[in-house]
């Protein structure tokens, strides 16, 4: 038996090696769009004869045997699982004619000997304006019960990062129209921002407002990747986007965001790849010259899923049980998020810190890629100040006089100094009261309280709940307003005038209105 099998294996090996090494095969693999044949992977696989059979199923790991033409690593294989299309991604080559794959959906019901077809390309998903307002899963199938997606263009989820020559080297800030962010922790155009915050402090509302403002100010679109999040949260977000006007029900004109979900209940393969699916959709819009916002909630779940996949594939774990390829996996995702000469992808990533340990390898690896951090504080949200961004904890490498200009830098630092002084005086105020402070400190406290309130802002997406019309504030108006505050120009105005207004002119107008009402 062994002797008879040897001649069969040899041609398979000979055929597999040239197929992988042929230069002509490379462009097809890296091509950004798929041909008509590639869009019908089953037909293509049948034509090429790359049909194998299931040899072993261990949870999310499936071993598939091919007689010849072994599929390349990262190729998508397809099989029918009780009437549903099941996609497997090749992760390892075992011996001469077996591949080990990770399933993108449940393998319940899969049987040995079942036919599997090689699509000849990585997992490919639809891209284009047809994605706006829709929800897709990791393999590009709609999951919002709004009918099929009519996109005509498809892209593989594994793409190389842009070459150095394609990248834009100019440091620019992305003006969001949100005062606290633009002044104290400005976002880099094409940068990566870490969003830290507990439950109920306004992460979702801030994300919605950013999507709305980028669409208004830059005409850009947004992509939201839900990586290993709760199904309930994903469902709530979808409906909130419709209620707040960010998206139209069922997609179509007027929708500003595409949603890509791989929830907590999905197998690790889906959660490890859904971030790449979302990024592929975002890259299409960037290549069309757009400024794209790409949200990931939660980047920790991406690492966690990678760790599960690594263990399933039998790799020896690294520190704290994470995969040995942790930095490589993170880099492969993060390096694709950048500004090119065509457009930009600016990424806002919610980061869960396990056991509040910032030295844990998962968050520590993410921090290396971040340009800015936006910290949402419960103490600030309890004061009723929204967005509840902590002005002293949030940072940005863009807050540099060479990038934002000397005036912006000096005003931002003066605002932070005033708030820091107020923070250090709070213990004295709590114990002894305001009367025990010096006149200078009383003035600092009064200004700091006005600054705190002026950092609040009415949001467009919260209009339906608050009744206050949203405000999009120009950067120059923001700098002008806070400069006047720290220099004492508005010491005569009451604190209440600065709460939930846009520009300083709005605050002056509100003060006059309050004075008229009091009279």
UniProtKB/Swiss-Prot annotation:
Disulfide bond sites: none
Top-level division of the source organism's lineage: Bacteria
Main location, first listed in the record: membrane
EC number: 7.1.2.2
Catalytic activity annotation: ATP + H2O + 4 H(+)(in) = ADP + phosphate + 5 H(+)(out)
GO MF entries: ATP binding; ATP hydrolysis activity; proton-transporting ATP synthase activity, rotational mechanism
Subcellular location: Cell inner membrane
Keywords: ATP synthesis, ATP-binding, Cell inner membrane, Cell membrane, CF(1), Hydrogen ion transport, Ion transport, Membrane, Nucleotide-binding, Translocase, Transport
Membrane topology note: Peripheral membrane protein
Transmembrane annotation, as ranges: none
Comp. bias intervals (Low complexity): 1-26
Residues binding ATP: 197-204
Region (Disordered): 1-40
PROSITE patterns xrefs: ATPASE_ALPHA_BETA
Cellular component terms per the entry's GO annotation: plasma membrane; proton-transporting ATP synthase complex
InterPro entries to which the protein is assigned, alphabetical: AAA+_ATPase, ATP-synt_VA_C, ATP_synth_F1_bsu, ATPase_a/bsu_AS, ATPase_alpha/beta_chains, ATPase_F1/V1/A1_a/bsu_N, ATPase_F1/V1/A1_a/bsu_N_sf, ATPase_F1/V1/A1_a/bsu_nucl-bd
A Pfam family the protein falls into: ATP-synt_ab_N
Family membership: Belongs to the ATPase alpha/beta chains family.
HAMAP family reported for this sequence: ATP_synth_beta_bact
Complex and partners: F-type ATPases have 2 components, CF(1) - the catalytic core - and CF(0) - the membrane proton channel. CF(1) has five subunits: alpha(3), beta(3), gamma(1), delta(1), epsilon(1). CF(0) has three main subunits: a(1), b(2) and c(9-12). The alpha and beta chains form an alternating ring which encloses part of the gamma chain. CF(1) is attached to CF(0) by a central stalk formed by the gamma and epsilon chains, while a peripheral stalk is formed by the delta and b chains.
Function: Produces ATP from ADP in the presence of a proton gradient across the membrane. The catalytic sites are hosted primarily by the beta subunits.
The protein, known as: ATP synthase subunit beta
Source species taxonomy: Bacteria, Pseudomonadati, Pseudomonadota, Alphaproteobacteria, Hyphomicrobiales
